[in-house]
Structure formats: C-alpha cells, structure tokens
C-alpha cells in the first residue's frame, strides 16, 4: 500500500485539482509540447521579470469544499434576516421553485455568454424577448431594452437619453421630483456632474417652472403616493421636455401605464418579479421608450429577424448604438447587463400569467388597504392618501415603534423627518398585518384583519383612484397564457434551454471574456435565505455575515491587485471603469486641477474604455500601437507631452488586448505619471495576472476587476456581473459612496454609481468561495494553467493559421489571436463563416474581429482539460482543411459547409440538400466527437441587415415558435 501523509489524504487541494482542467500528466505532456520544464519555467518565459512578483500571495492555504461551505455557513448565520417593510425599490418576493431550480440554479442558463452568436442562443433570446414584451405591456410604451444594471443606473441612462433627443437644445437642466428614491437621485446627480448638467430637485408640479431638457418622476413615489401625471406630462412635452418615469413593475399590473399618461421613457427594477433582494442585487432593470427614440436607447435590444431559410430568428438588434462599435460615441458604456435576472423575471410573468400577476398585485394592495384602514381607525395620520403597497405615517413615537419593530424582528422605513414607512410585498401574510398593528399601535389595539377586510369589500377601496386603474389588457400573447401548470412551465424552460450552447456542453473560448468553470459549490450559498433575503438598507448590525464576507473578500482583492483599498459597489466591469475614472476626476479636483480631463486610450482598447471616459466627462485622445500590437511609446510620449497640462489619465489593458505582456508597461505608467496623469489599468485580463504580477506592483493607480471573469461569477447569458475597483491610497477617499448606507468610510459622502451600497452583493459569495477554496497557491496555479492552455492552443493552431501577436520568447499570455485575413483574401471564406461553422462542431466561436478585424481571439481558461482543448483544435484543423477545398475550387465559394453554416435538422431533411456539393454527414457530423454528442443549432445563419431594417422587438405569433 502506498504510504501517504495525512495531509495528502485530507486532499485540501482537491477543489484546485477539479477546478483546473488538465491533470498533472496532461500538464506535463502539454509543457513538453510547448517547450517548458514546468509551470514556473513557462511563467518565467512569458511574464517580464521586471513585473514578476517575488513573493507569494497571502490569501492562505487552499481548503476542501466541505470546509469552505462550513465557514461560509457560519457567516450566513451571522446575518439576521428580519421581515423587511423598508421598500424603497427592494421587496420580498417568492421565487417560483420551478424557476429557482430550472433557471437560477441551472448551468444551462447561468453559464452562457451574451448572445453574440444568436444561432446557438435562440432559447434565452426568446426569454429576453418575453422580458421586453412584459416591459412594453406594463409601461405602455413601444420599445424595451433587454435589461440595465439597476433602477438608479437606468435613471441616469434616461437622463442621458433625454439630453440626446430633446429638441430643447439650449436647455441644460434636468428636473427630478423630490419624492424619488434617494439612491436614484444620488446616482443621477453623480452622472449629471460628469455631463455638466444642472439637476433641479423640487415638488413634481414645479417642473413646468424651469427650462428643461428632461424631467424624472417616481410612480408611485417614495412615500407611496400615486399621482395621475397626464396633464403635467402634456404641459412638459409641449415645452419639448423629455418625460422620464421610474415605475414599480408590480404596481403597473394594476395602475394606468405611464405611457398612457404621456411619458417618453419608463424604467424601474424587475426585482419584484421573482428575484431575491440579495442585499442589493443582482436585479434587472427594465427600460422602455417611445419608438422615435429607438436609436438613442442604451443597452442591448433583442429583435426579430429571419434566417437564410426565411424562418423567424432572434438576434441582438441595432448594435451600432453600442460601445463595442461606437466607442466614445456610444449611447452608453453598458456591456454586461442583467440577462439571467431578466430571464427569471420574464419566466415569473410567464408562469403566473396576467391573471396570476393581478391576483398577487391585488393581494398586496388589499393588505395595504387593511393596514391603512386599521391605523386610521385608531387615529393614526398618513402622509399619503393614495397607495399601491406603501403607506407613510406621521406623528408616531418613532423610538418606541422602532424598539417594538426590532423586538418583533422587522424593519420599517424611518425617515429623518420622523415619518415611518411601511411597504408590503408578495410575501406578506395576515399574521404580518397583525404583527404590524402590534408594532405601530402597541398591544391591545383590538383590530381584526378579517373584519377590516370585510369593511373594505363592502365600502370599496379608494387607495387607487378610478382614473389610475388600468383599463387595458396586459400580457395577451399566448406565451403568457399557456404555461401556468408546473409541468408545462418546466418543459417550456427546458425547451428554451436546449436551444442554447453553454459551458455545460462545451468550451467557450471567447477571448477577453474568461469563460471559466463556475463550480457548483461556489454557487450554493447564493440561494441561501440568509444571503438572498437581506434588504440592502437594513441596519448594518443585522448584516454582520455580509459585512465580514465583504471585508474578507476586499482584503483578498487588495492582496491580489497590489492596491490599498477596494470599492465593491460597481455592478459591472463597465460601471467599474466609470467608478474608477470618477475617483481620478475627484482626485484631480481636490488638488485644484479640475481642468485635467483628457484620457489617453490605445487604439486597441475595448470599446467600453472610450465609452466610460466619455461618461466620466473626459475627452478621449487615441494613442497608436506598433506592428507588434504594443503601445507605440514614441506616440504616447508625444501625446502625453502635448496634453500634459490637461492630462487626467491613461486607460490601458494588461496583458494587452492583443494577448501579450507588454515589456514597456512600467515605462508607460511612468510617462503618464511624469505628466501629472493617473494610470487606469483595465482588469479585463486579470486572469493572466493573479499570483504572477499585479496592477499595483506594475505601477497603476486604479483598476476594475471583473468578478464574472477572473473570480468565477457566471456570465448568466449577459449578466450579472460585478466590477469592484481597487485603488491606491491616494484615490481611496474618492471612490463611490452612498446616500442611504454609510459604514463609516472616508468616501461615505461621495456620489453613488449604483443603487445599492455594495452593488450586486448577493453574488459576492461566489467569488469569496472561489478565492477561499483555491488559496494562494491555487490562485497562482490557475493563472499559470491559463497561460499553459493558451500557449498549447496557440502552438497547435500556428501550424495551420497565422498567429497575429506574440510576446517574449514567442509566447502569448492567456489568449491568442489567429489571423484569418489571408484566408479571406485567398478563398473568400470569412471570419463569420468560420465562427458559424464552429457551431456545427459543437463550439461557440471565439471572439470575432476584436481587437483586430478579420481575426479570432481564443481564450481557453485554466478550467478546460487537454481533451477539450484537443477537440477544439481538431475542429479548427478540420475547418482549415475545408477551407483548403474552397481554395482549390473543389467547393464553390458560395456553396460550401462554411458559407452555409450553421446547419440545422431542417437542412438535412430537405430534399434540396442533394444539390449541395457536400454530404449531409459533412454538414452536421463533421467530427467523431459530434457524432456521439451533437448540439443542433435551431436556426440557420441570421440576416442582420434585415433585422435592423425591419425592426421588431416584441413577441411574435405563436405559430412562428412551433
């Protein structure tokens, strides 16, 4: 029997070995192939010595799954989940278990990527289209986005849209009603300052007294009052004011739509539709506008088009509005949105149907009526005389009420002016109303819920005025009226899932996206009620588990990045960029250098960089790259010197977007610092840094971290994400704060960038688990394996395709770029053809035409085994052989497996296929691996031009689905 130590038998590194794809023997085989003795040797060949860390991370040792779960369970138990009546945009909800199990906890839904390859994403595209239909029906407007990050961010986007489209071109004032949620006003003010807009806050009716380009109103407002704005909106629109409305999605089920009142833009949080509060997120925001504003909409929009067979097919529409194409001229910097949560909300609407939603909304309103009637019967005065779910009470002994509430384990809303608010929700029961009477009135009140209900039924309720009762039908499309049984709902979800390719089927090698394993053990805590059901504005002493988790995660990220502090608030990488640039902006202002507003950005940068710089009020100056893809130092020096007086910063990605460690990165930092600028190092490629180098060690001042890339939060088909920023000490006082929650930091009073103080805190346990389980050694080994996998793929493919950029010792970092331009010139086969042909082989295409047009960028990550890498390599080699047949004239350039890809079942069943110069087997079973595990695209190649020229972004007739 082999003698093993107890430490070996305890297998503390078991999670590490399961997270990393290649086992030790495969790693050695791959190392031998690429010409390295060990992972450390390979690292030394790739990473410049000048930036290589000489010491290990100080995260701690790796641990087993059971140990990690036990530790985080202890943190969860420190959270006190009181019954929340705080409201303010966050409400208790009942997540239907059929959605919880089959969507939220299903890797077929949460590991997919943004549907840039729509032919293999028709399932979630349909679910998102349903979300858009829900949004349009409830708001009464024409065109909805596929989701934004949160309600407050959506408000800022609405303000920006208003300025873009308003005919009041000379106006520079945006009016905000003084009864909006405070966190919404906070985020709007932050964005307005960057744009140079003036924000005027006042009673809603005073909006007409100002020269405005736009105005924002809350429906219902923070106190619960619901108002008919029809006349006010008409008066404002007559003055060319763009009217925007923050609306409650559940209230809209019963209320007259803002669109019917004359609103131009309506937005809000879809959290109430079956998504837990999660201490602030993640939640999908809906955003809907009039059709005339469609070209100015922010974010993704799903539209209906057709494929090459003329069949209905869905795709992302009007992408020319977005950051990856328009860069600093984009409508928004939005990249990652909240697709997983939007899908949950859409399925919630599908499962309940219109009648089920009306029942839920009516129950919430009835309980609110009962609560109000009982309190008023006892002489309690209310601030509001109309309501959907919220009443605000004045004249109470606030201290006594608060003491009784805490003793009863409930949280109410306590405003600074002595008003006490109570917001009810889907989870409210009769017993909760009894408990609220006890807390607000004290014992012995004698009120009876059943008697009060009978009184309301007999007398009728006036809480929703007749003029504000919705008269039009909602959700009439058959999709919302046929899946109310759980069996049918389960099958509908499965039917959509089967149309999509996600990580649970095959590798997704998207460069710059880091589609690594999202381990099941990392995902488990997210569903626990101790994490899922916390209100973000609850007293912090009730959230000790969350607080400790955030502090531990922040300290680990500080160690990994080499920075001094971390701000968790940003909800995505793009929002992290915006937050980091704001910190730089405020830093310069604090030094009397507000004129520093120029941001240098290499021409190879991701589109979010210039878009974020524009949002932060900066002017973009592009610097050149040399033929090797590196920053042209001479051009950088010249431009830095030229704009030195006004230089704010540089935004640079490391390793570069070309997939190499630039040797001159420290010199780049020094050049910018010498001219008074700051260095923003984009953390998109952090998966090639962890444990080997760090932004702080390199010389940067601030970075965002994509927790949904490097730190294992799943991409969710296009969100959620997290983009916390790490900063050097001198920038720490200038990171985002929050108007509601102030934990006692120097940055507390700064403006917010997100609605919640800790952003999408509900998914932070995923990254916490990832780091805790891997430990210092595991994090470093993961990075090294990512380098190994990328260089193995690069060397294998270099025998068949030109590799565009390489660094020292002919190596790449964690990703490589293959150049398809010579192939296109010789054969007519395009990068699009190759991307779609990969679908036939069961793969999602790598990143296409970024950072160089006519290329594919491949990032395999550390989680893919040698077996899967070889399967992908074999597919690419086989495709190269197919291209050779086109080059040789064996297959026509306009009729071959690449040009016609992807192939569907309908293709091979069609007798017309016999006229093609290749067989059905070549079309759909091009490799042995595919024969035993076939993924079938459900549509042929989609016509993008047709989709944009014939824009249609709502649910189509059911016959088109069947």
From Swiss-Prot:
Pfam families noted in UniProt: GcvP2_C, GDC-P
Enzyme class, first EC level, given as a word: oxidoreductase
In-chain residues carrying the UniProt-annotated modification N6-(pyridoxal phosphate)lysine: 709
Keywords in alphabetical order: Oxidoreductase, Pyridoxal phosphate
GO molecular function, one term: glycine dehydrogenase (decarboxylating) activity
Subunit annotation: The glycine cleavage system is composed of four proteins: P, T, L and H.
Family per record: Belongs to the GcvP family.
Function: The glycine cleavage system catalyzes the degradation of glycine. The P protein binds the alpha-amino group of glycine through its pyridoxal phosphate cofactor; CO(2) is released and the remaining methylamine moiety is then transferred to the lipoamide cofactor of the H protein.
Official protein name in the record: Glycine dehydrogenase (decarboxylating)
Lineage: Bacteria, Pseudomonadati, Pseudomonadota, Gammaproteobacteria, Alteromonadales
